[in-house]
Amino acid sequence: MSIEINNESAIEVDEPVIQRLVTYALDTLHVHPDAELAIVMVDEGAMEQLHVQWMDEPGPTDVLSFPMDELRPGTEDRPTPAGLLGDIVVCPQVAAEQAVTAGHSTMEEILLLTAHGILHLLGFDHAEPDEEREMFGLQRDILIGFAMSERGR
């Protein structure tokens, strides 16, 4: 699996933990081991520019996903074909603000946003209540499973 992480933000992030989360999530979702994914951490100014350009929304946001090959989750018998999943852009400053509200660490929020971005790259959305239940349920399952796997490290 090719997972590139590029931190262009002023906030330090634990890249090895992000790498392990992405690997865990993609394995859980039966994505082909040759799939490619890039994650970029950016400051608020860069995120605001992307948010305006791609979503026509003012201000910075927490995470944006840019799917490439429109891959979907696979199954144990039929994994997702190899391909380019796309890019996830995370703003650690926005994540830090949200973490305070949520009552957990900035890194936990960054992991949540990364899992959220992966699900968007794989075609999940949360525009409708049933889609939101499915996506947020998978997101929760990934984060809980990952946390349990990290305890064993």
UniProtKB/Swiss-Prot annotation:
Binds 1 zinc ion. Its cofactor is Zn(2+). InterPro entries: MetalPrtase_cat_dom_sf_prd, YbeY, YbeY_CS. It is found in: Cytoplasm. One of its GO terms (biological process) is rRNA processing. Its EC number is 3.1.-.-. Transmembrane segments: none annotated. One of its GO terms (cellular component) is cytoplasm. GO terms for molecular function: metalloendopeptidase activity; RNA endonuclease activity; zinc ion binding. It holds the Pfam family YbeY. The keyword Transferase does not apply. Keywords: Cytoplasm, Endonuclease, Hydrolase, Metal-binding, Nuclease, Ribosome biogenesis, rRNA processing, Zinc. Belongs to the endoribonuclease YbeY family. Single strand-specific metallo-endoribonuclease involved in late-stage 70S ribosome quality control and in maturation of the 3' terminus of the 16S rRNA. This is Endoribonuclease YbeY. It comes from Clavibacter michiganensis subsp. michiganensis (strain NCPPB 382).
